[in-house]
Amino acid sequence: MTGNVEYDVRRMFRHACAFTDCAIFCQKAPNSIVVRTQWYTIPEIVNSAFACEVFIKSLLLHHGMTLEEIRKKNHGLKGLWKAFRETDATSAARVEYDVTQPFNSQNPDFCDNMLDIMSEAFKEWRYIYEGHGACINMNFLIIFRNRLRSFCCESYYQMTWSEYESRGHASCDSDTN
């Protein structure tokens, strides 16, 4: 990290976008492979969960939390999201509203319940072969990841994800890291 908050959050944003790209590749790749020897759902989950983590951590940094404070949060999405909600309740509520709409849930705790289930997805699914069980709602994970990406893009670049994507990050940033 450079200590330049704007630079660092944008760099974190691009890194999270790269993990999102990897997750999307894992989702789409099996359709183009004739003889498959791997199941790509697990890498899709791991990359999506890690992208969510980095998106949220970039938001925390953007809102004034120090790197030391962020590091103490570890990987848990529930705790990270709770910290963001405490920092910017209005934006968090907007993201939660957008994420829960496709599910048409009347449960006011729907988002929290989903985050409870997937909070440790990065750690749990990364080592799923060790034999412990894990559960996740893929639709929620994907919608949450994509909404975080859009929200971060709006926050850091004042443009929609579609606008950012069509311009390419090279024209939005002075660096390419």
Per-region residue spans from a language model:
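Residue-level detector of short, conserved catalytic/binding motifs and their immediate flanks
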Residues: I42, C52, K123
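Charged alpha-helical initiation segments
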Residues: M1-V46, L59-T66, G168-N177
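Structural signal for well-ordered, non-membrane alpha-helices
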Residues: T20, I24, C52, R149-Y156
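Conserved beta-strand->loop/alpha-helix structural units within folded catalytic cores of enzymes
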Residues: S48-K57
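Long, charged low-complexity segments
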Residues: M1-F13, M65-N177
